[in-house]
């Protein structure tokens, strides 16, 4: 919304986990990593930022507790702190503040998201750092937005604001007073409940914004615009729009998504399909391809581990295309190869990415060229290596 009104924006993510980066984390734990233009493996949220804003992310836009501690310890080992006792405050919090300010050119706004939940031990240094940052940089130049969950109890047909009140109380106890509260809810929040949040959380009623379940995620910017979220942000900073906001692209996309009648089924076969975020970039690419072609893409996720030959015909019966993404390890490879064979014989459009393409070569070698023990030397040293590491050539 700020970008559409002529402002230059930078988006950043701070993750409280102790991993240095998400590159070596299991997709089951954290979903798929997002690779930035400069080659960094970062949190998948940076992918959401890029898709919504069309602003390219950099390695400097994502940091973790693990990276921060690693940097501080390396500096201490080199004598960078001149023998001082290294502590969370000020040394860790100073490093967090450096991250917020680092690599900024001529952006008007820097939006930093802190992962986790208020009250988590892991998040405390980040909350303390933004408290200090606001105090040092100026309260009129820093805006705190708190995202909170407002549950709807179906049994009693009521919305509960107590979790939000306690969350804000916890945040204020650390020294951070939210300026805007965004309330995530399944149902629209009645005015009297919003007034209650405003009263107990010390936030103006117009700054209590609801984000209700929408039919498609692309309706979210329109919803925020209708509630004047961008207007309240600019009002806080005493700024005016540089140009009139243009939400027609979002309205156009929403209209296509909601009114498209034609559907295509695309199967994704992989090891991590049980976690929706494990192949997030593929999901988004296919959905966006559907929008561009005025069709709804129905994604069928099939786990490769237990995929049997007898099941393939049934599971791939009505698919318009097959996608096998990247991966590693022997587990699930035979299921992928069997599915590729079926797609080739039935002339189903197929796309293999990285490991998926390697398995396509193995399948062709085995079933078309009749090389019975064809395989990858990465998985089996005794196979006929139609796929091999470059140092084995």
Sequence positions of predicted segments:
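Structural recognition of alpha-helix starts/caps
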Residues: 300-302
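Flexible phosphate-sensing "switch/lid" loops adjacent to ATP/NTP-binding sites
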Residues: 1-295, 304-321, 329, 336-342, ...
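Cysteine-nucleophile active-site neighborhood
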Residues: 1-4, 318-393
């Amino acid at each position: 919304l700020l970008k559409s009104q002529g402002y230059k924006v930078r988006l950043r993510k701070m993750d409280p986990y102790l991993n240095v980066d998400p590159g070596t984390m299991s997709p089951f734990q954290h979903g798929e990593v997002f690779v930035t233009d400069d080659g960094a493996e970062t949190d998948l949220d940076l992918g959401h930022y890029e898709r919504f804003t069309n602003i390219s992310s950099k390695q400097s836009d994502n940091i973790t507790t693990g990276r921060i501690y690693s940097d501080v310890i390396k500096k201490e080992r080199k004598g960078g702190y001149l023998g001082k006792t290294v502590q969370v405050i000020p040394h860790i919090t100073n490093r967090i503040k450096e991250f917020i300010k680092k690599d900024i050119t001529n952006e008007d706004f820097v939006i930093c998201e802190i992962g986790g939940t208020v009250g988590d031990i892991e998040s405390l240094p980040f909350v303390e750092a933004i408290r200090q940052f606001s105090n040092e940089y100026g309260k009129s130049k820093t805006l705190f937005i708190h995202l909170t969950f407002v549950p709807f109890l179906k049994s009693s047909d009521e919305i509960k604001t107590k979790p939000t009140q306690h969350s804000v109380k916890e945040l204020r106890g650390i020294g951070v007073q939210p300026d805007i509260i965004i309330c995530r809810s399944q149902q629209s929040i009645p005015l009297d409940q919003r007034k209650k949040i405003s009263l107990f959380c010390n936030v103006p009623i117009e700054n209590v914004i609801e984000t209700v379940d929408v039919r498609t995620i692309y309706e979210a910017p329109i919803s925020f615009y209708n509630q004047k979220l961008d207007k309240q942000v600019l009002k806080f900073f005493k700024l005016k729009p540089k140009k009139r906001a243009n939400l027609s692209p979002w309205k156009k996309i929403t209209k296509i998504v909601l009114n498209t009648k034609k559907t295509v089924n695309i199967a994704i076969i992989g090891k991590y399909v049980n976690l929706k975020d494990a192949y997030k970039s593929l999901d988004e690419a296919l959905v966006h391809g559907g929008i561009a072609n005025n069709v709804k893409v129905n994604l069928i996720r099939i786990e490769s581990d237990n995929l049997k030959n007898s099941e393939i015909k049934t599971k791939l019966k009505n698919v318009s295309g097959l996608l096998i993404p990247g991966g590693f390890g022997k587990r699930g490879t035979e299921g992928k190869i069997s599915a590729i064979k079926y797609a080739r014989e039935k002339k189903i459009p197929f796309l293999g990415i990285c490991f998926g393409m390697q398995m396509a070569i193995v399948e062709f070698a085995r079933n078309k060229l009749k090389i019975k023990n064809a395989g990858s030397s990465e998985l089996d040293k005794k196979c006929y290596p139609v796929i091999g590491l470059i140092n084995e050539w």
